[in-house]
Amino acid sequence: MSITPQEALTRCIEHREIFHDEMLHLMRQIMQGQISPVMAAAILTGLRVKKETIGEISAAAQVMREFANHVTVKDRENFVDIVGTGGDGSHTFNISTASMFVAAAAGAKIAKHGNRGVSSKSGSADVLEALGVNIMLTPEQVGECIEQTGIGFMFAPTHHPAMKNVAPIRKEMGVRTIFNILGPLTNPADAPNILMGVFHPDLVGIQVRVMQRLGAQHAIVVYGKDGMDEVSLGAATLVGELKDGEVREYEIHPEDFGLSMISNRGLKVADAVESKEMLLEALSDVPGTPREIVSLNAGTALYAANVASSIEDGIRRAREAIASGAAREKLDQFVRATQQFK
């Protein structure tokens, strides 16, 4: 079922939904540059103002996956993505990136999909480059890295070439659009499990149900009530969990896991170099807030990956991986693996 750009814009203005097949058609046109920049910007604005529905987001994510350069991973057990929407304005160090190394050291397989900075002064791509990682890998090379180390990093522009038709429009608009919430939904390795942080509490219930429609196995979507797109130490965290086909929404608190509630102020960084230093502190078992929040988020990722039976069990495994030096060694191993392709 097709819809003209003008009809789509009218639906948005009238706060009516664009149906699944219509959204597929519309999104394909946008991704292929078949809609003028003015009309594309108007539709993206209209969707944002009326608020994107679960059906619209699911269809748009499906199209982005169609256009992606995919990564093939044979062994998909305990396979997880750890990702945030960004845009939370917290300017913290790269917690999800640090958590990736800890979770991999504790037995998860990670396919992390990331880009340069949005919410932080340093996106996952920025800090990985600062650590010496070669992020410019082909899909085949990413697959090899996952086989060798249990970690693959997929730099979004490499894996979503069709975004070149949308990037100038998004840049000129300078406001959040549906694409800000599509990134975490469009992992090119199709990881069946995910820990996803979001920038707004309303997105917890929306994104977990989108993941349900997209066929995820175990999805955990989180929003820290202090505004973080991570599991927070500074406040309660809203959780949407998809497991065994069922969605559950609940709150967790640091105290639930024997952790103290600590302000996240000490996690702020100015750039990728500061983020790298804080990440290395956490992986090197230096006592402090960075280590604690990485243990909490890596533990949640281990639960999402079905390595751990609960978040609490995951935190215990994460702490062991850090204390034993395995997490730091995993980082070094990953740097070496990516450098072999230079």
Swiss-Prot record:
InterPro entries in the record: Anthranilate_Pribosyl_Tfrase, Glycosyl_Trfase_fam3, Glycosyl_Trfase_fam3_N_dom, Glycosyl_Trfase_fam3_N_dom_sf, Nuc_phospho_transferase
Residue sites binding anthranilate 1 per the record: 84, 115
List the taxonomic lineage: Bacteria, Pseudomonadati, Pseudomonadota, Betaproteobacteria, Burkholderiales
Cofactor info, note text: Binds 2 magnesium ions per monomer.
Keywords, ordered alphabetically = Amino-acid biosynthesis, Aromatic amino acid biosynthesis, Glycosyltransferase, Magnesium, Metal-binding, Transferase, Tryptophan biosynthesis
Answer whether the UniProt record assigns the keyword Metal-binding to this protein: yes
The entry's function note states:
Catalyzes the transfer of the phosphoribosyl group of 5-phosphorylribose-1-pyrophosphate (PRPP) to anthranilate to yield N-(5'-phosphoribosyl)-anthranilate (PRA).
UniProt-annotated binding residues for 5-phospho-alpha-D-ribose 1-diphosphate:
84, 87-88, 92, 94-97, 112-120, 124
This protein is called what? Anthranilate phosphoribosyltransferase
**The protein's Enzyme Commission number:** 2.4.2.18
Instruction: State the organism of origin.
Output: Cupriavidus metallidurans (strain ATCC 43123 / DSM 2839 / NBRC 102507 / CH34)
